[in-house]
């Protein structure tokens, strides 16, 4: 089996991006160890702090954020970073070529129940000139790499450098990420959906109707039965979609009119959308292709509908949108 470094060499990924991706991979190994130790290391539970989103930070949120910050600061290829756990962008190395956006521990509410969590990351080219928030506000199609690391029964990385989506599995003995799927492909059709049904009454009418039709099964307009899956961690739900197809959504809702969206564009929706598109799937807000959105702020939130291409198209048809054409890639 090829190592991560060997695969990046075969893909002719340049040396600076290769080094950055290896830095992220090495740091994820350390994070995997921290997650695995859990209560034995006293890292479970919450802090008394909130992040900029107003969410109470778990101890491991802070620990993993610091681990990634320290590693990226030591990597001369990184110009700056943005994190779910940082109020503002962080300048790193003046000569760095790349910007890194990340969610250090997605699904951290799962930590205390020993369920799935992961790290999500996005790599963008660093524009010339002074570094500020505007430097990061690039559409998702500008990403030069994106991926996540899932800390489950085995530690797995999903990665794209724009040459399809690959899976790597961390070998326990060698501590190397080994290529275990060189061309992940999402099935175009599916009978599985992932959504937080407890919010159903707050959704827009198109999504309420779409889900209601799925629940009607064989007696409804879809004329087939669907199963629901929900891990409560985007990284876990998207991993399942990449492995066996499905549609995942965190749609617009009016539960809190001031916050109609849940997921963050720059370090959740964009990297996942690129992974999904590179695996043959689609990703939309319901009204706009996610990778085409021009960001307006680093912690911007968006609605997300992604997964099996034909099922995403069907969902979008309920929204009055025809996205049956292939997305254009600059």
Curated annotation (Swiss-Prot):
It catalyses: beta-D-fructose 1,6-bisphosphate + H2O = beta-D-fructose 6-phosphate + phosphate. Pathway: Carbohydrate biosynthesis; gluconeogenesis. PANTHER family: FRUCTOSE-1,6-BISPHOSPHATASE-RELATED (PTHR11556), SEDOHEPTULOSE-1,7-BISPHOSPHATASE, CHLOROPLASTIC (PTHR11556:SF35). It comes from Shewanella frigidimarina (strain NCIMB 400). Its EC number is 3.1.3.11. Keywords: Carbohydrate metabolism, Cytoplasm, Hydrolase, Magnesium, Metal-binding. This is Fructose-1,6-bisphosphatase class 1. Binds 2 magnesium ions per subunit. Mg(2+) 2 binds at residues 103, 106, 268. It is an enzyme of class 3 (hydrolase).
